[in-house]
Swiss-Prot record:
Classification via SUPFAM superfamilies: ARM repeat (SSF48371)
Region (Disordered): 135-175
Record bears the keyword Repeat: yes
Signal sequence interval, chain numbering: none
Key words, A-Z: Repeat
Organism per entry: Homo sapiens (Human)
Stretches forming HEAT repeats: 530-568, 724-760, 761-794
Record-linked PANTHER family: HEAT REPEAT-CONTAINING PROTEIN 4, PBS LYASE HEAT-LIKE PROTEIN
Protein name as annotated: HEAT repeat-containing protein 4
Gene Ontology molecular function: any one: oxidoreductase activity
Length: 1026
């Protein structure tokens, strides 16, 4: 063994030669057969011999078997390479909760004192290795579990594993620990074998290809120990990347100064030295589009810098700036630019909002005294002067509860203008507590947009175009710099999206003018910086980009001729989406050509929603003032075979303006009277009314209503209801239709009166007359409906409606009466009592449902005489029982028979002044002392149960004989079988007194036969007496 100058121990070279050769994956195998020194030397020194493939596979399999025979791994190796083989109970999840890799802390690597290298030999009797030791444990890996729990920060870089160093003069069965990593490369390379030197030759190649920054970074991770000689990395950096190599080639003084600055930056970066850099220009914050449009609820905030581990420059910037601090610099704004130097201008955000944007200040109860809250929820901190002596909250160590808000006399002086508060938004976990606000003396005027119809059309056009191409645009978060960069992007879709964002912002920005001063302000639709890029997009090689740029030019209303040419090309050759957008843009510009009108009419006749229909009508109405081509093309559609096209053409005539020729008037009148479709006739009549052609229609209706047949009168009345047309000349003929002989005419007159809602006395009298005296129930129902639509309430109408709902036989009339009461909102005790009475007797489901709904809406509660009504219902239910009614009827028959027999058989002397016996007196005397109690359900007689014993039994098929007509059991004659005897035979069987055979009375079984002896008792007595 030898000892070096530094006191480290090394083994002799002979011990190294006794070790077996290494495998490809860096593992040492100890062969028991190779024990001699010569054999070991021969293995390490003999050059490589190429064997056959089969022999190599055979040897490879033997090596694998021998290597895996008693192979064991340390715990640290298992944790690093064999995690799937570790049981779940032994696995540690501490590294999941380690935050060192999220927030990196710079660590300073301290030099450790040198320690002598000591070698420990593990004998063959080691419990881990057995006969052969295959694992090597160093002192640093003595406690692998502790090192695994303590995770390293992400900023540290692990050193690459170095090949195992073989030491000489070691026993073949022993494994030694490699020397310390701090040993110089020169000393380690002195005893390396040639194969090891060749294996390490890759370092020279790697060092040649490393750049300066990577080499210096590696050097910074392995700092030189104090007192030690410079290592190979430091010498490599000096030789490879020394600035003195290029210093002689520089000639200008500026280049030399730049070289010194670069050297100082590198020194500060890798040796932690502070360098005073020249002041740099502060980066100007990007301008948001809402800030450009001066929206009151937007203001710029300071730009935050992303922090990277180890980057001290960004950390210093982060320490100086705040995340929630608003911008410190703001552009100046003036009240009226025309005032020149006499106008007030300011760059304070608070003054700009309250003076220029006219945002009101909200005085909140319980708010902070040092803050100002505006209508847009922006908060500003007051810059107040200090108050002496200071309050206890400043110098007290204990927390003092916040007192309730109380008025304070006096006000503190402002030392500066208010600044935006940092806590503009609620902090995490803070609740938004509603605060009572004082009522302002003057209510703020509602802000309404001052938008022209051209702008509305452009907004709708752009919205439809974006929806068709599935473009989702959010312009409130875009900046001018970002849009300018996107306009020059390489990809077409990025340019299209940027152009569409510009067009959307120009059209959708708020246009609120609350005063004359605001109306004088001129804010361009887009910043001047973006206009050249947008104009350049008109010459883009992509057709979609050019189309988007043309739409943007029309959005800002620049009247660019190149954009007009693009739109005309898209109108003729483009797809349906682009051609429809082009037609709208060209129509807004006043281009009333045949292709534009044809495309608009095509979109109108194939419309899919109401917005498209409204857009088409607006454009056609605007173009109709410039040309008559629209009326000509619509007149062609009036002769279309499709009734829907005729309706659209009539509606278009009623919406557009312009002069209409006489032929079109006659065509519309013809459609109004003779078209087979009801909707077409209605649309034609409305078109004539909207086109100021009411006189011609009025004269025709007057003639047909007074001199036409029944069908013409019905059509005339229908048109009167549709057009809402009634004059003094039409009224006499209209009143005569209420008494017409035809039902259809009277029905049409009621419908027209309800549609016109005429409150004329004569019309109301005609409707009341139909309601009372018309023989057809439908006419009564239509008259009642017309009275409900007119809404004229009178006592006579109330009486007639209540009478109709109570006594009319037709359910339809009662239903319409109930609906008219609801329409007229009739209330009161009389109405409620009538409804309650009708509910007891009404049996129609529709009428009952309508009555319940009417009572619920009119709040006609069921309080009234509910107790009395319930008692009446219970009494009726009790008296309506079948057995009680049968008993009363039989008793009444018995009494009447007795009275009849007494009058026939017994002579009674008449009494003076005694009137004849009436039915009412007879009923009172018969049922005077009788009390009827309501029965329980169990006491009610079950008729089926009573009749069941006397019913004939059903034949049993198993007891019948196979021979038809023969049965095993004789048929039992029942008393319910029809008696086939004649009347003389029945009288002979009954006898002269009809009391011997009561069961044969009337020839059938009935309840009446049970009382026959009682009823025939007078005759029995008479027979006995005779």
């Amino acid at each position: 063994m030898t000892r070096t100058q530094k006191g480290k121990t090394f083994l002799p070279h002979c011990f190294y030669q006794s070790l077996p050769p290494r495998l490809g994956w860096g593992m040492i195998l100890n062969y028991s057969k190779l024990k001699g020194k010569e054999e070991c030397a021969s293995v390490s020194s003999v050059p490589m011999v190429f064997f056959s493939s089969q022999y190599r596979l055979h040897r490879k399999s033997q090596y694998l078997k021998m290597a895996a025979a008693n192979l064991t791994f340390s715990q640290e190796v298992v944790w690093q390479r064999g995690l799937p083989s570790i049981p779940y109970s032994q696995y540690s999840f501490d590294h999941l909760y380690n935050t060192n890799d999220i927030i990196h802390t710079p660590q300073i690597r301290k030099a450790r004192p040198q320690k002598p290298v000591s070698f420990k030999f593990l004998g063959s009797s080691s419990p881990l290795t057995g006969d052969t030791s295959l694992a090597v444990k160093t002192e640093s890996s003595a406690n692998p579990e502790k090192k695994l729990k303590k995770s390293k920060p992400a900023s540290t870089v692990r050193e690459a594993p170095r090949p195992l160093i073989h030491h000489p003069c070691m026993h073949p069965d022993m494994l030694g620990r490699p020397p310390s990593l701090d040993v110089n490369l020169e000393e380690r390379e002195a005893w390396l074998l040639p194969p090891e030197k060749e294996a390490r030759a890759w370092e020279a190649t790697v060092l040649e290809k490393l750049n300066e920054r990577t080499a210096r970074w590696i050097q910074s991770k392995r700092p030189r120990r104090p007192g030690a000689s410079p290592n190979k990395w430091q010498s490599f950096l000096r030789q490879q990347y020394d600035w003195s190599h290029i210093r002689d080639e520089l000639t200008s003084a500026s280049d030399l100064e730049l070289l010194k600055q670069l050297e100082a930056e590198e020194t500060a970066e890798f040796e932690d030295q502070s360098v005073i850099l020249p002041p740099q220009e502060k980066k100007k914050p990007e301008l948001l589009l809402p800030v450009y449009y001066r929206l009151p609820s937007y203001f710029q905030q300071a730009e935050t810098v992303e922090i990277m581990p180890g980057n001290k420059s960004t950390e210093d910037i982060h320490e100086k700036t705040s995340l929630s601090q608003p911008q410190t610099q703001s552009y100046f704004r003036q009240v009226t630019p025309r005032a020149g130097k006499f106008a007030y201008s300011t760059d304070n955000t608070f003054e700009q909002e309250i003076y220029f944007d006219e945002v009101q200040i909200i005085h909140q109860i319980g708010a902070k005294r040092d803050q100002i809250v505006l209508e847009n929820l922006n908060r500003y901190n007051k810059q107040l002067s200090k108050v002496f002596p200071e309050t206890p909250e400043k110098w007290s160590a204990q927390a003092i509860p916040e007192a309730s808000y109380r008025p304070v006399q006096g006000a503190l002086r402002w030392t500066a203008l208010p600044t935006p508060a940092k806590d503009m938004l609620l902090q995490v976990g803070e609740k938004d507590v509603p605060i009572k606000t004082r009522r302002l003396k003057k209510q703020a005027k509602s802000l309404q947009e001052d938008v022209t119809w051209e702008l509305v059309v452009l907004r709708r056009m752009l919205k439809e175009w974006k929806t068709a191409w599935a473009l989702i645009i959010e312009w409130h978060h875009e900046t001018v710099e970002n849009l300018l960069q996107s306009l020059g992007d390489l990809h077409d879709d990025v340019r299209i999206k940027a152009i569409t964002t510009c067009a959307t912002a120009a059209l959708e920005r708020p246009r609120i003018a609350t005063s004359q001063r605001d109306s004088d302000k001129t804010i361009q639709d887009l910043p001047e910086v973006l206009l050249p890029a947008l104009e350049a997009a008109l010459c883009d090689k992509n057709a979609h980009v050019r189309m988007a740029a043309a739409i943007c030019q029309y959005a800002i209303q620049s009247h660019n001729p190149l954009a007009r040419n693009i739109m005309q090309t898209a109108l003729l050759k483009g797809n349906s989406v682009d051609s429809w957008a082009a037609a709208q843009c060209l129509a807004l510009e006043g281009t009333a050509t045949y292709p534009v009108i044809k495309r608009i009419l095509h979109q109108l006749f194939t419309k899919k929603n109401e917005d498209t229909e409204e857009q088409s009508y607006i454009l056609l109405s605007y173009l109709s003032e410039k040309t008559t081509l629209i009326h000509t093309m619509l007149a062609v559609e009036l002769n279309s075979c499709q009734w829907k096209n005729r309706i659209v053409a009539c509606q278009a005539f009623s919406r557009i303006s312009g002069n209409v020729c006489l032929d079109m008037k006659h065509k519309l009148i013809q459609l109004m009277w003779n078209d087979w479709n009801k909707e077409v006739r209605r649309a034609a009549a409305q078109a004539l009314g909207q086109m100021s052609l009411g006189k011609e229609v009025h004269d025709i209706i007057r003639v047909k209503l007074g001199q036409g047949n029944s069908q013409e009168r019905v059509e005339a009345l229908y048109l009167i209801g549709e057009l809402k047309l009634m004059t003094a000349k039409l009224l006499p003929s209209f009143l005569h239709c209420f008494s017409d002989d035809f039902t259809a005419v009277r029905r049409a007159a009621c419908l027209a009166a309800g549609a016109l809602q005429i409150r004329d006395k004569m019309v109301l009298e005609c409707l009341l007359n139909l309601m009372q005296r018309d023989p057809y129930w439908k006419i009564k129902a239509f008259a009642i409906r017309a009275l409900g639509q007119i809404g004229q309430v009178s006592p006579e109408l109330t009486d007639l409606l209540l009478w109709a709902i109570h006594y009319e036989e037709s359910p339809g009339v009662r239903l319409e009466a109930c609906r008219s009461i609801l329409a007229l909102k009739l209330q009161g005790d009389r109405v409620r009592d009538t409804f309650l009475d009708v509910l007891l007797l009404e049996n129609h489901d529709a009428v009952l449902k309508e009555m319940y709904q009417t009572m619920k809406i009119l709040n006609l509660g069921n309080e009234g005489n509910q107790e009395m009504l319930q008692e009446i219902k219970n009494r009726i239910k009790t008296l309506s029982q079948k057995d009680l009614l049968t008993h009363k009827i039989l008793k009444l028959e018995m009494v009447m028979g007795k009275v009849r027999e007494e009058a026939k058989r017994v002579y009674l002397k008449p009494k003076g002044e005694q009137g004849p016996l009436t039915l009412q007196t007879l009923l009172q005397e018969t049922f005077q002392d009788e009390m009827v109690l309501p029965r329980r359900p169990s006491e009610v007689c079950d008729t089926e149960a009573v009749i069941k014993p006397v019913k004939p039994r059903a034949p049993n098929p198993w007891l019948q004989s196979s021979v038809p007509g023969l049965t095993t059991r004789s048929k039992v004659r029942s008393s319910l079988v029809k008696d086939l005897r004649t009347s003389p035979e029945k009288r002979i069987a009954v006898g002269p007194f009809r009391s011997d055979y009561p069961a044969l009375y009337l020839g059938k079984f009935s309840e009446r036969t049970f009382f026959s002896p009682i009823m025939s008792s007078p005759s029995g007595k008479k027979g006995a007496h005779l």
